[in-house]
Amino acid sequence: MFLFAGLGNPGPKYAGNRHNIGFMALEAICRRHRLGPLRRRFQSLAAEGEIAGEKVIALFPETYMNESGRAVSEAQRFYKIPLDHIFVFHDELDLPPAKLRIKKGGGNAGHNGLRSITAQCGNDYFRVRLGIGHPGDKALVHAYVLNDFAKSEKPWLDAVCDACADFADLLAQKRPEEFQNRAHLFLDAQGFGEQKRVGEKG
């Protein structure tokens, strides 16, 4: 069994925020693979189903970003899911827009959602890092991640969510490197190889 957790803040106020790209990617996976219906449990909205013949629970924590670990750990304990069967989809300031990377373990790069999960569950889960770019000044980060994606960003955002949905079966088959490679090729083919951040010159 696998746990796919999207990170974001609950409710319509935050739905379009850059910080919520993890929710958006997981929503695309749920639609594509018909996971559902959504039910309130584990301090989350949760959907269940199968991907590539494996049982998957998709988790949208309702704890707000900084307490995501409470929800993830509750579901993990209930189902006794090993850490290397957990994939967390989250926004990544240190990657350019439309870049996707996957890694197991490592630091939290200042991401409070990851910090919370690591504190509650341990470190050896997979992070699916979804690049949103950096505003260029640390003082601007808070406003940047809590602002909605610009209209001009929608094409690459949709493509990133499509890539996650298209290749989610590779995650359920424990083939994370192949997931990353296939997503990279897909985004390249869509013309999103070198995306600029909104407002970036170049």
UniProtKB/Swiss-Prot annotation:
Site residues, Discriminates between blocked and unblocked aminoacyl-tRNA: N9
EC code(s) of this entry: 3.1.1.29
CDD domains given in the database record: PTH (cd00462)
Binding-site residues, tRNA: Y14, Y64, N66, N112
Enzyme class, spelled out: hydrolase
One Pfam family matching this protein: Pept_tRNA_hydro
Residues carrying the site annotation Stabilizes the basic form of H active site to accept a proton: D91
Keywords tagged on the record: Cytoplasm, Hydrolase, RNA-binding, tRNA-binding
InterPro entries for this protein: Pept_tRNA_hydro (IPR001328), Pept_tRNA_hydro_CS (IPR018171), Pept_tRNA_hydro_sf (IPR036416)
Catalytic activity: an N-acyl-L-alpha-aminoacyl-tRNA + H2O = an N-acyl-L-amino acid + a tRNA + H(+)
Cellular compartments per GO CC: cytoplasm
Record's subcellular location: Cytoplasm
Family label: Belongs to the PTH family.
HAMAP family xrefs: Pept_tRNA_hydro_bact
Subunit and interaction comment: Monomer.
The name this protein goes by in its record: Peptidyl-tRNA hydrolase
Biological source species: Xanthobacter autotrophicus (strain ATCC BAA-1158 / Py2)
Gene that this polypeptide is encoded by: pth
